[in-house]
Structure formats: C-alpha cells, structure tokens
Amino acid sequence: MKNNRFRISILFFTVAVAMLGFGIVIPILPFYIESFGASGSTLGLLMATFAVMQFVFAPVWGNLSDRYGRKPILILGVLGTALCHLLFGLSSQLWMLFLARAMAGILSSATMPAAMAYVADSTSEEERSSGMGILRAALGVGIILGPGIGGWFASISLSFPFYLAAALSALAVLPICAALPESLPPEKRGLPGTDVSGLQPGALWQALFGPIGFLLLLAFLLSFALTGFEGIFALYTFKLYGYGPERVGTIIVLIGIISATMQGLLTGPLSKRWGETCIIQISLLVCAVGFVLMLQAETYYEVLLTVGFFIIGNALLRPAVTSLISKSTTRAQGKALGLNNAYMSLGRIFGPVCAGFLFDSNISYPYLIGSTVMLVGLFGSFFWLEDAPLTVKTNCSGSKESGQI
C-alpha cells in the first residue's frame, strides 16, 4: 500500500505539471495569436485543432500502453508536451502555431490514458476511485492554476509562460525515469482486446452500444458542459460584470483549489460510502443547479459561490465516471480509458464552439443549455447505470447489489 501511495504521488506530480502547460495557454492564447494578426475565427480553429488531435489519438495511446507498458508512454507524452510548449513560444508564423498545437494535442493525449491505466493496474477496485480522484485532482491543479500563472507571467512577455511550461514538463520526466516502476508486467501485455490500431471507422459509435456506452456518453456530456462553461466564462463575466483578466484569473485559481480538495480528499471516502452510481447522480444534479444559479449571481462573492457550487459537482463526477469505466474490463483497461479520453476530447471540440454560438444569441443560453445537458445525463442514469458492469453496485440508499464483469 505504501508503494502504491508513492507511485501515485509521482503520477500526481507528473500529471499536474504536464497539465499546467495546458492551463497556461487559456488566458494567453487570444492575445498571443492576435499579435500574429489572427482573427477570432482563427482562434476557434486553433483550439479545435488541439481538441481534434486529442480526440483521435487518445485511444491510440491507451492501446499502445496495453501493448508496450505504461511507463514509456508516460515519458513520451510528457517530453513531447515540453517540446510543443517550446515550439509554441518560439513560433514566428501562424502555421507554426497550428503545427505546435496539433503536436500538443497528439502528444499530450498520451499522458492521462497511461496514467489512469497505471492507477488501474496498481489498485484494487475498492481503492481505484480514490486513485482516480487523486489523478483528477492533479489534472485540476494543472489546468486551473495554469491560467493564473499564465496571466501573471504574461507581463514579462506573451511567450515567457510557454518557456516556463516547457521547463516544468521536462522536469516532470525525471521522477518517472528514476523512481516509477512499470505497472504492467510483460505477460499481461498484448492480451486480446489490446490492438493498437486506434480509432477504426465507426469504432466510437459501436462503443456507445457496448457495456460502457452510457458511461462514455456521460464523459462526453460533462466535458461538453464544462468546456462550454470555461470557454465563455471570461466573456460572460466581462460583459455582465466588467471583470478583467486578473479578477477572472483569481476566480479560476479558487476553482482549482476547490476541485483539487474535493477530488483528492473526498472522492474515495464518498465512493466507498455511497458508490459511484450515486455519486454520479448527485453530481449531475448539483451541476445542473449550479448552471442556473450562475445566471442569478449579481455580486463578485455570489459569482464565487455559484461557480464553487458547480465545480463541487463536476469535481466528484469526473473520477466516478472514470472509475466505473476502468472497472468495466480486467484486461484492456488502457483501451477503455483511452475511449473515455476520446469522448471527453469530443466534448472539448463541440463544447466551446456551441457555447460561443449560443453566447452570441443570448449570454444566458450557454448556461441554460449546460443545465439541460446535465439533466439529460441524470435522467439517463436512472435507466442505464443499473446495467453498469460492476462486481458490486451501491445505490444511493447505501444498499449493495451483486453484478457481473
């Protein structure tokens, strides 16, 4: 158990630092590409390029980790991310920005499937939700604190935060190489179901009708809603309250603290007490209500409270869904978790685009649609999560039911 904690601590550090670079880009990207004479539509294409590459390559990396092990894929993902940050900061032409973002989408998508599969290899089913929560906390720390760091260091130069992110990512490789053992023994590699062909035509559609289909749909819905929220949050608060980058950055940092605390400390105990299915249902309801409350906020502190309420639900929802997906298979966990990341990437493609279109029509529409999406997931969970492929299922009343894998 002590070894597992040490290994997961290394993964926490690695994922947090790797995702920090992604977060750093959020507040800087619009200003950075503007210096190249690019328009808002170019910004949208640039963001979509990153998300599309993640969507396509996440299952490929998950499958490769089933074939060759978790450690080499982790190293490749983190080092590749460092290189992409450096290239982005050194870019002098618009095409170089697109190349750097495309490469970042490809290589950064290797980190999370391999890290989550590592946790799945190293933990029991009872401990897995807690382990996934710790990884999600690392994800939250990196992505949420990144915008604050990016905004603060952008005063030096718009390219400086990218150099900083590259240096930190390169540093994160050291503990992986020096202290993280491989979690997947050679005899378990390349088992049936671990082909490395990645996304075949219709594979994602077929997965929706498989044993984890509804869980993959939930992964898409929560990613769609959250990235829609994030995509227009700065625009929404600027238009409604006149908030500038510093105040928005402060809100995002507070969101990160809440998210990391919830995922790192409460996910495991709550899942053991009530089970993932109950956590998912409660979290979907909290997120739906949070979207609506956001529309009612009038003061800065009310904005903080309503955003915090929404983030609590989201922080519990992500690891619960991921944990159920990892429990759906005892062999091809990397592939299943790669599909999970692919559906989340698909949500990241459409979420900001739809939110931006809705925002142009009415600034309240993105949050109303976000609430509706969460309610659709909630109602669906009452019908389809009963068939989740678990050894033991726990409902919200605390009683347990036997299931199958």
Regions found by a protein language model. Name each.
Residues 55-92:
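Conserved MFS/SLC helix-loop-helix module at the cytosolic interface between two early adjacent transmembrane helices
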